[in-house]
Amino acid sequence: MKGVYIHIPFCSSICSYCDFSKVLYKKEMVNKYMNALEKEIIGFYDNEVISTIYIGGGTPSSLDMEDLTRLFEIIRVFKLNDIYEFTFEVNVNDITEELVSFLYKNKVNRISVGVESFEEKNLKYLNRKHTKKDIFNKINILKKYFSNINIDIIYALPIESYNDVKSDIKNFLKLDIPHISTYSLIIEEHTVLGIKNVSPISEEEDYKMYEYIVRKLKKNEFVHYEVSNFAKPGYESEHNLNYWNNGEYYGFGLGAHGYINGVRYENTKNLTKYLKGSFKINELFISKQEEMENEVMLGLRKLDGINIEEFFNKYNENIQDVFNIMPLLKEKLLIIENKNLKIPEDKIYIMNEILYKIFNKEEACQN
């Protein structure tokens, strides 16, 4: 299974927390970008069968209909009729009957909406331009065409209360859609919040919010299938599962990453260089050891974890022999169920600490 990620960096406004490659929308710049994107795809795509496509950003829905028509002409090379899952990211206020109908007719079958919060103060803090009323109105338009809809929610804002989080989840459940991605706010250095030296909330408060989200969503029959992702059965994100299963994927566009034929690569974040055709800035040939490490780091994000037999068949190595597994099994920081090595759900919140112990045998032995 191979996926394709396409990055559209244009936005109508810049959110205070965003650390992705983005630029304000300018029509003449979009035209140049589409030319460069087409050149990159033609030059690097090797005509393999593609199972999933994800168009993200930035804000893909900031493109006008002429831009979108050009984009979809470019990506027809991926044989859109054969794509199993095709996700397109949208901002709430960009959702119109015209846009949604266009996406539906052009084989998109999954929509991801940047909601972030239903609370007015939180939306203002994040520099989001929509309201709670907008969210409900626009999701109703989407539901005329799509059943597979995700929203993103950001929690643990410095101005946010525990009750705000409860309210956000309550409102999400009212939408009656099958997927939600919940992210604790990370204050990145070069964002608006980072420049203002905003301090994050305490780990205790963060965990309390996270624990509530997990408990409430599971109570409402959502499957907690990855650290930050919850879905009704059958609505898990196949594109993202391919990432977490250490599958191969193309990354096209400004700042995109890819992993093809044992090579991980990164595209430039410099728009001027990208428009001139200097796409890749880094290519890394992955050793077997690095590949196994990636398999563990990505696979343990999933609540199902890593199948031990599949790991052996893929690498001809026992995972217990390669990594510091046994002490963590004794500490119950890892468990084995149905031949899957995984982090227990009540420990997934400290996944990064567990991964550190897995890859640092000496320190783990001292503890």
Regions found by a protein language model. Give the residues of each.
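Immediate flanking context of iron-sulfur cluster ligation sites
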Residues: 1-8
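Short, amphipathic alpha-helical interaction segments positioned at domain boundaries
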Residues: 346-367
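Local cysteine-cluster metal-coordination motifs and their immediate loop/turn environment
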Residues: 9-20
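Minor-groove-contacting beta-hairpin "wing" of winged helix-turn-helix DNA-binding domains
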Residues: 340-344
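Intrinsically disordered, low-complexity acidic/Ser/Pro/Gln-rich regions
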Residues: 207, 329-330
